[in-house]
């Protein structure tokens, strides 16, 4: 990939008020994107956002920039990221733009683009937008300026799309479900989808105020959901993150069910229904228990680099239809073009309803291995600790001790001078000791 100035692996992201997430930058980004995308045709762009207070400011800036370039904006209001991908496809819009920083705190925000088919913008288009950013803004003739309008039925359209991924012959009428929307973009979508499919729904994290997105709620912090599931004696809980592209579940005993377990359930059900084409894609962080459980079922498994973008790339390379990260990004290419928390959750609920099994029992075929993660800070510029002979020697010793019933993964953080030491195996005490032994070797360098 070329050395781009603004676009990262997941669009442009940062703290609001600091470059690049400022009104003037975002206005220019809208204009530059408009100039590039106007070369292609429909001249309309879908703009969605999550529930952050800064979304109002940033969507206005984007709209002004797009209008100056001669493109019209269609606003969805607060809407999950996968909903914007879906609406971009169905409206045949030139692109979709999501204003969100996903699972980050409210004071961060970001801009992410989808192309006309609901997939990520090609690198070449992002590079063309960056090149346009270097130019002075110029306005099209007044008669050519873009307009702005709202898609008044955006939520209803997406609710119907989600429901259509759940089999008609099944119902959720037997289930009591606690849903946690992270005070984010799914707050007016997910409870309605589940209720319309017959579930008894208790909703939490559905009162966004602009600053409480992801705050002690949602997929990145399921403690409130676990407590409520137990208090309500519910059958299960479902948590989404701030922009609705991740899902984490909780069984009736309050146990967390992560993206690895969710993918296992969906892949096994696909196999049972004769609908699984090929295998499943996880990441370097996917639990070894997932790999072994899929192997027992005869389902091929491949690991991609961490990041839903890389999972999708590996799925496309293999021609497979299902992929997931343990953080709850689940991509089902038979249903959607991108990670969709609501759609993934519905496939697990369908497996429960069809088999008359609890979430707890559906997970029982997969034994999760203890996975210990230790972060070790090192001095930036002091060389690569992973290349040091002493670290390599200790790592090799641990790998021999674990044999084929465990894994060691050492990787550098992409954002700060940290080495992430992950050790996985069947015995938690042994795995913990091994992880700290490697961490100590890294510290000693």
Curated annotation (Swiss-Prot):
Residues the record lists as Phosphoserine modifications: 102
Taxonomic source organism: Escherichia coli (strain 55989 / EAEC)
UniProt: Mg(2+) binding residues: 102, 241, 243, 245
Functional summary from the UniProt entry: Catalyzes the conversion of glucosamine-6-phosphate to glucosamine-1-phosphate.
Gene name in the database record: glmM
Family of the protein in this entry: Belongs to the phosphohexose mutase family.
Top-rank taxon: Bacteria
EC number: 5.4.2.10
Cofactor annotation remark: Binds 1 Mg(2+) ion per subunit.
Cofactor: Mg(2+)
Descriptive protein name: Phosphoglucosamine mutase
């Amino acid at each position: 990939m070329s050395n781009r100035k603004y676009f990262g692996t997941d669009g442009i992201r940062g703290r609001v008020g600091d470059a690049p997430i400022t009104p003037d930058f975002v206005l220019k980004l809208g204009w530059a994107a408009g100039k590039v995308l106007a070369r292609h045709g429909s001249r309309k762009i879908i703009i969605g956002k999550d529930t952050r207070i800064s979304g109002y400011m940033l969507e206005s800036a984007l709209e002004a920039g797009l209008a100056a370039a001669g493109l019209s904006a269609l606003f969805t209001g607060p809407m999950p990221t996968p909903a914007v991908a879906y609406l971009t496809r169905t409206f045949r819009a030139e692109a979709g733009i999501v204003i969100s920083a996903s699972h980050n705190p409210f004071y961060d925000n970001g801009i992410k683009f989808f192309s006309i088919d609901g997939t990520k913008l090609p690198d070449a288009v992002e590079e063309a937008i960056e090149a346009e950013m270097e130019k002075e803004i110029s306005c099209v003739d007044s008669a050519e300026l873009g307009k702005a309008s709202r898609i008044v039925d955006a939520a209803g359209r997406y609710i119907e799309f989600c429901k259509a991924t759940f089999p008609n012959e099944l119902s959720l009428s037997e289930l009591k479900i606690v849903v946690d929307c992270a005070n984010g973009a799914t707050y007016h979508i997910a409870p309605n989808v589940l209720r319309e499919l017959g579930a008894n729904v208790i909703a939490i994290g559905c009162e966004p105020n602009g600053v409480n997105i992801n705050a002690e709620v949602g997929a990145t912090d399921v403690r409130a959901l676990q407590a409520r599931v137990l208090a309500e004696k519910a059958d299960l809980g479902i948590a989404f993150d701030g922009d609705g592209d991740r899902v984490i579940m909780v069984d009736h005993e309050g146990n967390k069910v992560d993206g690895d377990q969710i993918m296992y359930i969906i892949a096994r059900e696909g196999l049972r229904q004769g609908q699984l084409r090929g295998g499943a894609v996880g990441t370097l962080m996917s639990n070894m228990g997932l790999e072994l459980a899929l192997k027992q079922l005869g389902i091929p498994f491949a690991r991609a680099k961490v990041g839903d973008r890389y999972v999708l790339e590996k799925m496309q390379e293999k021609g497979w239809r299902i992929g997931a990260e343990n953080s709850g990004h689940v991509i089902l290419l038979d249903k959607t073009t991108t990670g969709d928390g609501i759609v993934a959750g519905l496939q697990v609920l369908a497996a429960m309803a069809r088999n008359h099994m609890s979430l707890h029992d559906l997970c029982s075929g997969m034994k999760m291995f203890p996975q210990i993660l230790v972060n070790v800070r090192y001095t930036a510029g002091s060389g690569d600790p992973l290349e040091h002979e002493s670290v390599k020697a200790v790592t090799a010793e641990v790998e021999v001790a674990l044999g084929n019933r465990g894994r060691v993964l050492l990787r550098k953080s992409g954002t700060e001078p940290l080495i992430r030491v992950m050790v996985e195996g069947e015995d938690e005490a042994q795995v913990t000791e091994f992880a700290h032994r490697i961490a100590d070797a890294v510290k000693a360098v």
